[in-house]
Structure formats: structure tokens, C-alpha cells
């Protein structure tokens, strides 16, 4: 246990000088006991000086304070004692319910599983959300990204997925709140408590108001807890809200560490940092991690380096579109932009595949005809095109669905739609069985039978 002293403090970056024979290693944790602050070593500058990032506010620090080297990376509690608790980046409880009382602690920096230990993900995971199950099905042990700009419903979709999967799937879940609103964290905690699944969820928060060090490392803290459950042979769910804030924290830290920025001001190590995190989120022969990650898209630009780097790592991408949200269709998933590796006749079966492609084909044709309709009106279309447009508008409305977590706001009870019913319903619309129903009947209903009932009342 060597001791050093602080020599320079610039925001969240603190330089510490140690005796030359006992310089701490990169990623080792240091403690400033006077203020109870943990630092993480990022660079060795030579002459016994290391550059560190503070895992907390650096207010009240001054030069010459004593710093202790713990001789190991940051470690956090793992295991069943973390369930039902809210912890911060260091694994300290923040829910005022006493110590975690863990039996084991793991380092947050770990190697990704070896290539021969990985197992492919092909089993489907039903979410009960029509548009997702039909167009971009999720795999058990797969990685899913929810992409969307500000205010199109990433967090609400995430909450609904957690509600549907966590209540239907009886395993453990870990939720990492990375740089999101504290209010959402609080809402989420109460949502879990009310649906009686809190005792199966570990919550790790590093919110918007935290220093960049916390936001950069909190994703790793949550991931480490999920990895422990996976190594025990369980199938665990990992929710991360929001991956973009992880990148953003990296950008803030990178600038403070004095690195040259790359495109759009991001850190030069963007792809590597993303890879280090994403390669650990994977399924092995022992157990699986199914991860659902919200990805904020700055200014609705999917080609921005941050979302673009995330795309490469995912099995399924659910793209939320502002144009669809403007029509009042929620979930605002874009069925033409969202993709999934699972949408393959060998995995989902021929019928599901054909129905999904027919739905997309109809919507694509409608999109192409929109300009003609805007200029010349519906009357100028051929009979066949009129029918396509009418069906596409029904499909578009039928892709909306009332959510359980949004009941309070919408006043309509949530619906969980099994995959079989989803496929049959859309097959019927595409084949023209419901051409006689008005399109309003398809808006905000669960199954097709509800649409038929609704049509009778109109």
C-alpha cells in the first residue's frame, strides 16, 4: 500500500505523485481518505506521476493531499444480495437501506469471454409488442439497441420491455442507468416495486448530475453484476439506458486527459471503448446475457459517430422515428428502418418471414406513393395502388399498441400480444380479410379481434 500526494487538479482529472518504485498500475483504484474519494488511474505520465479520473466530485480537493494506492481495480458487490438494491458506480448503496452485505466482490475491469466459450443466440424472445415481435424479433442472449432522438419514447419502450420480459421471464435482471434523468431512475424503481419484480432486479445508477468518471464506469459496474449471474449458469437480462451517455462521458474524460479529439469532437478511442464494453456483453456456454440498450441519436442523425459505432455490435436494431411519433403512433418504431438478424426463415419460420416482408413491402409502396398522393390526390391512383394504400394505413395503425407502463397517461389498459396472434393478425390484413373495416378501428388495440370489436362501435 504505497502513498502519494495530489499535485494537480483540473475538474474531474487529478494528477497524483508517488515514489518511483511504487507507481500504481493503469486502472488501479486510489483513495483520498480525507474526503472519501476514489480515483482511477488512466495514464502514467513518468517521474512517478499518474493521471487519474475522480469517481465523484472533486470539490474540496487541494494540492498535497495524501492518496493511498489500493493495489487493485475498483471492485463491486456481486450475487443475490445486490437484487432489489440501488447502487452507485462503486457498488455503494444509495437507497438508504443499509449495507449490501455481499459475500463476494468482483473487479469491474474483466476480459471478454474467450472465443471458444461463446454460444450463438437463435432462440426467440417474445416481447408481447407487435411491431418488435413481427419486424425485428429479439434473440435470447442477443443484443438489442433502441435508437431514437430526444423524446420519441426510448425510455418508455425500455420500461415496457422490462415489464413484459421481467414479469414473463422469471430470471434476474440488471439495470444500469448511465447518465439519465434521476426522475426516470426514481420512476423506474417504483415501477419495479409496484409490479413486484424488484427482488429480481439489481439497479446501478450514475445519473446526469454525476461527474464524468461515474458515468463512464457505471456501465461496467452493472455489466460486472450481470456477468456474475451468467457465470452461475443463469439467463440474465441487462438493460442499459443510455449507451450514448457512456460515449459522452468518455468524450468529456478524453478531453480532460489531453487527447486529440476525432470526428465531431468524440474521443479518438471511441470504437475501442465501445468494443471493450460490448464484447463483454455476450452469451457463453454457461449462461446468457440478453441486453437491451437505449441509444440516444443526436439531432436524429443515425450517421453520427456514436450511434454508428454502436450499430456494428447489435443483433437487432429498433429505430424509433419522429415522423411516426408525430402521427400519434406509439410505439414509434420505424418498421422499414428496424432490422434483426433473427428475421430469417430458418430461425423464425417461413410464415413469420413472409408476413413480415409483406407488411414491409406494403408500407414501402405506400411511402413511394405518398408524393403522388400529396400532389395529385388519391383519385389518380390505380385501383391496385388504392388498395395497397388502404391496407398500408391499416397496418400502420395496427402497429400501434397501448402500453402497460403508459396506462397512467393514456387511460387505456396495456396489451400483451402473443407472437402467434401477431402473425395471424397481420397475415389477415395483408391478404385483405379486413378491407371492409375502417382504419380508425386498428388504432391502439391489441389483437385483431379487438379491432373488429372496435369497428362495431364506430
Curated annotation (Swiss-Prot):
Its main location: membrane. Its EC number is 7.1.2.2. InterPro entries: AAA+_ATPase, ATP-synt_VA_C, ATP_synth_F1_bsu, ATPase_a/bsu_AS, ATPase_alpha/beta_chains, ATPase_F1/V1/A1_a/bsu_N, ATPase_F1/V1/A1_a/bsu_N_sf, ATPase_F1/V1/A1_a/bsu_nucl-bd. GO terms for molecular function: ATP binding; ATP hydrolysis activity; proton-transporting ATP synthase activity, rotational mechanism. ATP binds at residues 148-155. The keyword Transferase does not apply. Gene3D superfamilies: 2.40.10.170, Bovine Mitochondrial F1-atpase, Atp Synthase Beta Chain, Chain D, domain 3, P-loop containing nucleotide triphosphate hydrolases. It is an enzyme of class 7 (translocase). It catalyses: ATP + H2O + 4 H(+)(in) = ADP + phosphate + 5 H(+)(out). The keyword Lipoprotein does not apply. PROSITE patterns: ATPASE_ALPHA_BETA. It is a peripheral membrane protein. PANTHER family: ATP SYNTHASE, ATP SYNTHASE SUBUNIT BETA, MITOCHONDRIAL. Belongs to the ATPase alpha/beta chains family. NCBIfam families: atpD. This is ATP synthase subunit beta. It comes from Nitrosococcus oceani (strain ATCC 19707 / BCRC 17464 / JCM 30415 / NCIMB 11848 / C-107). The gene is atpD.
